[in-house]
C-alpha cells in the first residue's frame, strides 16, 4: 500500500536491518512490540477502572482500493490527512494525559530525529493547558523502559536547535526520567510512576 503525506511525498517506513541481535524474552513480553504492550496495559487500566487511555488513530485519506473478492477490500494507496501528534491520550484522576511511545536499539542515547516538530509543539500545548505530557522510551537491547516528562524532551529539542547534541544520552534519561516496571498485569505499569511524579 502506498501512503503519502499531504504534500504528495511518499511515506517510506524505516527499513529494519536484516540481522537483529538475539534478545532474551520474558514470559510477560515475548514477541510483543512496545505499542502492543501499551495497548494491553491501557486495556487493563480501562477494565479495572483505573484510567481511560486510548491509542490515537492515524488520520488517513484513502485514495485507491482494490476489491479482489466481494467480501475483501485491499487499500492500495492512501495519504496522511494531517501530521499526527502523539500516540496516546486519555484521562487519569481527572487530568488529561498525552504521551508518545518510542523504541531505540541504541545502547547509549536516544536520537531526537525520532521526534517531529509538530509533536514537540503539541506537547508544549498540552503543558500550556495544564495537561500531563510525557514520553515512554524503550531501550530494546536492555529491555528497559523510562517515562520522561515532556518538559525535558522540549529542553533537549531546544538544545539541539542551538547547536547542541542531536540525541539524549541514556544517562540524561536515567537522571531525569523514571524507570518503568514490567509485569504480567499490567504489562507496563506507567500509572504507578504518574502517581509518584505528578500526583504526590
Swiss-Prot record:
Signal peptide: none
Cited SUPFAM superfamilies: Restriction endonuclease-like (SSF52980)
Annotated InterPro entries: Resolv_RecU (IPR004612), Restrct_endonuc-II-like (IPR011335), tRNA_endonuc-like_dom_sf (IPR011856)
Protein's GO biological process: chromosome segregation; DNA recombination; DNA repair
Compartments where located: Cytoplasm
Highest taxon of source: Bacteria
Record's function text: Endonuclease that resolves Holliday junction intermediates in genetic recombination. Cleaves mobile four-strand junctions by introducing symmetrical nicks in paired strands. Promotes annealing of linear ssDNA with homologous dsDNA. Required for DNA repair, homologous recombination and chromosome segregation.
Name of the protein in question: Holliday junction resolvase RecU
